[in-house]
Amino acid sequence: MAGPAPSGRTPSHAQSSLPSLPAHLQSDTHLTAHLASRFHVGLPTARLSSQALISLNTYTTSSRGPDGDKEGSAMGEAEDLAKRAFTRLGARGENQAIVFLHSSGESGSGKTTIRSHLLSSFLSFSSTPLSSKLSYAAFVFDTLTTTKSVTTPTASKAGLFLELQYDGSSSVNPTLIGGKIIDHRLERSRIASVPTGERSFHVLYYLLAGTSAAEKEHLGFDSSIHVSTSGGKLSGASIGHKRWRYLGHPTQLKVGINDADGFQHFKTALRKLEFPRSEIAEFCQILATILHLGQLDFVSGQATTTTAEESGGYSHEGGETVTVVKNKDVLSVIAAFLGLGVEELETSFGYRTKTIRRERVTVMLDPKGARQNADGLARTLYSLLVAYIFEGINQRICAAEDSVANTVSILDFPGFSQASATGSTLDQLLSNAATESLYNFCLQSFFERKAEMLDREEVTVPATSYFDNSDATRGLLKSGNGLLSILDDQTKRGRTDSQFLESVKKRFENKNPAITVGSTGQGTTLISQGARSAFTVKHFAGEVDYPVQGLLEENGDVVSGDLMNLMRSTSSDFVRDLFGQEALQTVTHPQERTAIMQAQVSSKPMRMPSMARRKAGPSRLAFDAPEGDDQDEYDSQAGSMSKSSARRKSTMLANGMQGAAGQFLSSLDIVSKCLNSANLNPYFVFCLKPNDRRIANQFDSKCVRAQVQTFGIAEISQRLRNADFSIFLPFAEFLGLAEIGNVVVGSDKEKSEVVLDEKRWPGNEARVGSTGVFLSERCWADLAKLGERVVPVFPAEGSDEGGDNLLHARAGGYADSKVRLLGPTDQSPGGFIYGEDGKQGYSSSREFDGRSDAGASAFNSGDMFRNLDTREQMLEKGNEKKMEEVDEAPVSGSRKRWMAIVYLLTFYIPDFLIKTFGRMPRKDVRVAWREKLAINLIIWFSCAFAIFFIVAFPGLICPTQHVYSTAELSSHNGKDGHNSFVAIRGIVFNLDKFMPSHYPDIVPEKSLKKYAGTDATGLFPVQVSALCPGKDGSIDPTVLLDYSSTNVSGSATTVSTSDTNWVYHDFRYFTNDSRPDWFQEQMIMLKANYFKGWIGYTPTYMKTLGDKSQYIGSINGRVYDLTTYVAGGRRVQAPVGKSVPANVDRDFMDDLVVELFQRLPGQDLTKYWEDLQISDVMRERMQLCLDNLFFVGHVDTRNSPRCQFARYFILAISIFICLIVVFKFLAALQFSRKNLPENLDKFIICQVPAYTEDEESLRRAIDSMARMRYDDKRKLLVVICDGMIIGQGNDRPTPRIVLDILGVPESVDPEPLSFESLGEGMKQHNMGKIYSGLYEVMGHIVPFLVVVKVGKPSEVARPGNRGKRDSQMVLMRFLNRVHYNLPMSPMELEIYHQIRNIIGVNPTFYEFILQVDADTVVAPDAATRMVSTLLADTRILGVCGETALSNAKTSMVTMIQVYEYYISHNLVKAFESLFGSITCLPGCFTMYRIRSADSGKPLFVSKEIVEAYSEIRVDTLHMKNLLHLGEDRYLTTLLIKHHPKYKTKYISAAKAFTIAPESFAVFLSQRRRWINSTVHNLIELIPLNQLCGFCCFSMRFIVFVDLISTIIQPVTVA
């Protein structure tokens, strides 16, 4: 403080008050030198008298002074400031405000540290539990709003107005009764745009690091993502594993901040603030949702599957570009936590509705736009969550406004920013505007505010020059025409960035030197272009260029109505509350309050300072508030902010939504007026950084001097040397404090002058005015004997060290020790919490120790979600649709029969399984699933039947036989490349395989090869007794049976009788080497290894043999030959030396059996064999003898009639199908002759539905129809725009593109009119605008009519869009009502008026309508040829032409479609045209007959067609396939059904060119849709009796064949 100069014995650095330094030391240089001298002896602070504190960050500890205690430290000075403010609060009843100022938002000036010391000091003055809650609240604020920047780990990114509320019961020590956290404009852009080398908000890192394994599992965090909690560096594996887009570079996950502990403290703080555990868990789920939103990957895809809400030219030929989410697993996590359906959430990312020129349009977004949409949702969620938490805190800590007597306000706003780290110009502008305003308040407090009162009191003080930033402050913040007001006004008006820049230039050019706009002269360089698109503001801390690109859109800060309506369907109560809070201001439609048009996250605090809610009383004033008319305005504004949210929202509804700049300006104005109120005493804390490199204990004079100059500290110090007055006391109060009684005689002024003389206070600290005395705070304290008062300091809860425990034992914060700076130690927004030596910052360690509370312990260390729904349950709830009661419609008999078939095929799948595992809670969805399954089963059954019919059926009729005729056996003789086969007793063996294994191997293969193709039975004599049991069960071994070959023509070649090789195989009884079983063993071996088949005997050949006296016959398909037996080929022979026994029976076969073969030679004896009168034992013995001795082969039935049928039946079917194809081709040839067009005078309508096509496609389609060689006056071009939608790649809505092509200026804006649309419920009401005029192109002047479906005013998403079918119905319903003379809707009346009165043609004159898709180009003669065909045959109802590809050579996929398109038209449609029954008239290029030529009877627009085609109730799978997947084909079906006497035709002479899918995925998707539509429409056509042709070859049969071929196509292709 000013006083006598220090004596020579006192070192210069001992003087803490800068104004007390000599006058020659009051320059910037000398003051900087003085600060340096104090800094180097451990005194990093100085004072500007009693009103301001200057603090330098030492980057070491802020709690130790030169002597090792807190004396002289930043912490000690903060305590002293708090005590003085608290004392003044109690003694004078004044509101106190401490304003923090620093020259750079990224300075590392230690601001947050000083603020925490200051708050801790204030809280230590009260012993209520509320003190702890306020410390927790401050910690939560820092956790949610603080981040790490390049230069400091504790960069606050939201303005803080922290209010401590006191009652007035005690004039000495006021009681703390409440508090309030008022946050101003969080830097939302940081959520989705983390600058390089910086972090997002700390709480996101806390969540990732501090959750347990079970919690990570629930939140969808990969368990393999390892975040170390030891404070060390990340391992390479954990860094490289996964990158969180919203968390910056992976290295930022660990920068020496103990995130895991921070998360535990964050949860504990919320619990201490009385937030329920379930709500804290919901907070964490929303934070996890935000992180997952950053992980979504969007890709472009093609979609051809249409719904009721889709439309356009792509519906028949091409595809629509859509944006889809690549990683569906992440999407499902987000959907679960938000309580939404996965599909609807994914769809919402792909479009965005906004207002352009007073019209709402839906923009179809590309992947980049979808990414921005997801970023916007993340910003909205975080902003709402922060607002929700702060409002919850305030509800718990704020006292009733009428009980608050005084307040202490701590203002800490982000500092000045030279450049935007996140790329957000708006955040930078608003932050700098706030800093500019606070600095202006500082200057006003020191210079202007006191000067006005000094003049009134006739006190003269020397003037002090200073830098006044009023120009910049007024230019930025002036209400009405300040820069922020202009920005807000231009945003409301929907102006562009360039228009805003022009407005700024007009407002400030040559009027305010602080704001300039870049030169508008011509320039080509990037620098000059950038200068022209920016404005410059000369702030007190330097000039800043603000680019305007995207500034107005960012200022709008609009949350689209799409998102709001999506969130209204959430199944999560918390998310519903989040989006229902007052912080989200919604705009509803005036006529339909339930429809939310858009919303905005408020940039204005939800609460106001307590002092702003009431006028200042007449009690003890310090200095007067600024005079003017703003007091009433201030009161009015304060009153308006205290009204209910409903009133606020209705005001916003009437006046338009206020932008972020306007809201921030309003809140800043309230702050400014609170600070300028009469009963408030401000203190200022200037936070300076000693160097730019964050080096501990290093003082950079140049760096500090620049900050001293920026803040004007030298000028302020000089001002205080002249007038350091902080308090004004009226004479009576002054004399009462002086206690001089009646000792001095004179006036009050004279008495006061005597007191001042006695006190010997310096003149710059005490002066007598006309009505009172001006005093500095030091003099007032001396006068009031405040030094005798003791401010109580209460210990922190659970502390053993008294009051200091709540203060920072070390400058707890991010800016403390070298160890913290250089090593990975604990840092977090509560870095103050983790004090060294167990000391704390905001709160004591015990308070934050979850173990002190059993519940908190389980909450902190376990799974906080264990009592909540699992993620799967949340997802299931989100996917559930709200069940609505629907009217029961009568079910047709065919539907009942079909459902009976469905349940018959799917009965084995219980409904609860579909509901549980299939996640289909709705009954109609489950029924549709059953129908799909039934159709699949029918298709696969059909395919299985086709496979059976093709593969198995011939085998059933004619089983495969492995037999060889004698000719076939002879051909396998090993010659000319043939195989070598040999037969033995009717069995054929593979000789080629046998020869290598023949024993002995000395026999050459050549010798064996001569038997190839022969019957070698003669080489193998048999032992009869070993192979046949005979009649009695045994045969004498001497009985022999000779073998003799058949010499009938056609018999197999046998071994020559002169071949003696049989002796090597003779092991009969009479030989020296008797082996009875040798033959049987060899046959078993041969059959097992070399078997090929049997000798085959056809029935004819058998009969021939029988006629030749061969006793041969077949039993059960086996052929037996008893010729040798009957002829006496039985003899006996005994071994040498033995005699034949007497009475040997040589007839070992039963006589009845032999007699059977003799009686019926060459026949099938099976029936006679079964009827033979012998015993079963005898039958069994005779069967064994026949098989072993007389078997010669199998009956060969390969040429039987049955086998011939099986062979040629499939062939006949194939030939029949080929004949159909050939017939179709021949029928197609009948249409090769082109009809010659003539000059025609019929009126036609050319209709084009437009959806999201680009300008080039639309122009091609429109121009091609306008240039058709048809009388321009007799054709009407009608373009129907399906909704206000901006397609991907377009810069305007589709209707605007169409109108620009047709030359309709933007000034033409007709009123939207109502009409009936296709939709459910309220969707049936739609509105449209009608435009008409003449379109001129290449010499053609064509009348046009444009119908723009804009939707009801309450429609938000895809306004007006109802689908292509609805676009067709606009004209169909209009023409129907014209011809039937029915009442019309307002829009239809307008269409009638435009056509009848503007264009000048009676709508009934139009006879034909040509429907063309927006991506189709028609040939010049197309309309003429179609009309000629329709006139040539008045029984033709519809005619289509040939559609070719305009992108045939774009890709391989389009190339393969060229042939398909050609065949489908010139073969299929040409054939169908022969019958006059085209089953599908393509919507992309078809002309219909509106009315009959003779009677005028409506045809295309008849009541039956219009009613059936406008079906709204599409609740079955069949109807969905008809109306949603193939509306063109279904329309053709209706025409054939309701007008059976009329024909549908195809003419190849009419040409059009369309766009086909270029990717294989889209091609498959399109074909899948077409196949579904084809099958269901063919099913509709089958019952029609009118599908007849000539003779029996009917079109109905061909349709049935097409249906079958479509169903079994997978099999036929295979």
Curated annotation (Swiss-Prot):
PROSITE patterns: CYTOCHROME_B5_2, MYOSIN_MOTOR. Residues 626-635 have a biased composition (Acidic residues). One of its GO terms (cellular component) is plasma membrane. Residues 1-788 form the Myosin motor domain. It is an enzyme of class 2 (transferase). Residues 961-1020 form the Cytochrome b5 heme-binding domain. One of its GO terms (molecular function) is chitin synthase activity. This is Chitin synthase csmA. It comes from Aspergillus niger (strain ATCC MYA-4892 / CBS 513.88 / FGSC A1513). The lineage of its organism: Eukaryota, Fungi, Dikarya, Ascomycota, Pezizomycotina. The gene is csmA.
